[in-house]
């Protein structure tokens, strides 16, 4: 038995699916409670399990999808972050959309980075970084670090991240962890967006895992990515940007599986938008650099 949970901007839905019989056993819906996600998640889980009349031990896998990340970015409700930009002039990164991604949040620009061959272009001033981090620590919840050509040599990103973690204990996104592509300014923007989402998606995952554990469900929790594939909860805690369009992707994959059709047009309608998709092309979206 499979349990699917989708936390959207308005409702949290749950479904029990019997894979062996290819049958939907029960569905349930509960309002998404943004002030405390546990209320909506628990409500949906309790309702669907009551309707399905099953034991918690019968659930073998839990699949979680959500539009919380998408909505947070669209509505500008991501958490406050700081960007650490190494080896780039500010105007270069600005052209990639840094101002739009950061808003009023701070950015630290440092000399450093590497050349295309992986050799250091300039030394990295870690003492200055430490001073800057201390000055802005109270204003942010996470950091995003991007260094020039870090995909060829991540040394400066790793060193900067170590300083930030030691001083703050807060989450740090490294751009070379998100992509192997060379466009550093766009990697910087993607790293910023990822950092904005960390606490949001981490909160959802932790809430869901706790709700399941309280009800005796010991099945692994997997999360739907924006391309429809499943990844571990630990993975999306560090890379929540991978859940962009998670909800619509789950709708598309689910519709294709339930109907068994090779070609179909699927409509995904919610409070904020309507999406039309073709079943032979699973949703593929990334902020530039999620495409390897």
Locate each region found by the language model.
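N-terminally biased helix-coil "hinge/interface" segments that flank
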Residues: 1-275, 284
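Single conserved hydrophobic/aromatic residue that forms the stacking wall/gate
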Residues: 276-292
């Amino acid at each position: 038995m499979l349990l699917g949970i989708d936390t959207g901007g308005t409702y949290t839905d749950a479904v029990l699916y019997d894979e062996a019989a290819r049958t939907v056993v029960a569905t349930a819906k509960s309002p998404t409670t943004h002030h405390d996600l546990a209320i909506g998640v628990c409500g949906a889980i309790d309702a669907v399990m009551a309707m399905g009349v099953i034991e918690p031990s019968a659930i073998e896998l839990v699949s979680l999808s959500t539009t919380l990340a998408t909505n947070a970015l669209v509505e500008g409700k991501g958490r406050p972050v700081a960007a650490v930009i190494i080896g780039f002039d500010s105007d270069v990164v600005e052209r990639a959309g840094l101002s739009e991604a950061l808003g009023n949040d701070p950015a630290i620009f440092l000399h450093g980075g590497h050349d295309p061959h992986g050799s250091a272009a300039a030394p990295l001033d870690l003492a200055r970084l430490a001073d800057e981090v201390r000055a802005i620590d109270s204003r942010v919840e996470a950091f995003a670090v991007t260094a020039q050509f870090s995909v060829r040599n991540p040394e400066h990103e790793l060193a900067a991240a170590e300083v930030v973690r030691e001083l703050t204990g807060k989450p740090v996104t490294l751009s070379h962890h998100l992509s192997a592509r060379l466009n550093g300014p766009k990697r910087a923007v993607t790293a910023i967006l990822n950092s904005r989402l960390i606490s949001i998606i981490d909160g959802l995952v932790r809430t869901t895992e706790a709700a399941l554990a309280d009800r005796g469900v010991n099945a692994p929790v997997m999360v739907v990515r924006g391309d429809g594939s499943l990844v571990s909860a630990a993975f999306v805690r560090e890379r929540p940007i991978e859940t962009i369009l998670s909800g619509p992707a789950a709708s598309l994959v689910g519709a294709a599986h339930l109907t068994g059709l090779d070609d179909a047009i699927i409509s995904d309608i919610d409070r904020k938008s309507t999406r039309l998709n073709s079943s032979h092309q699973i949703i593929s979206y990334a902020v530039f650099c999620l495409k390897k």
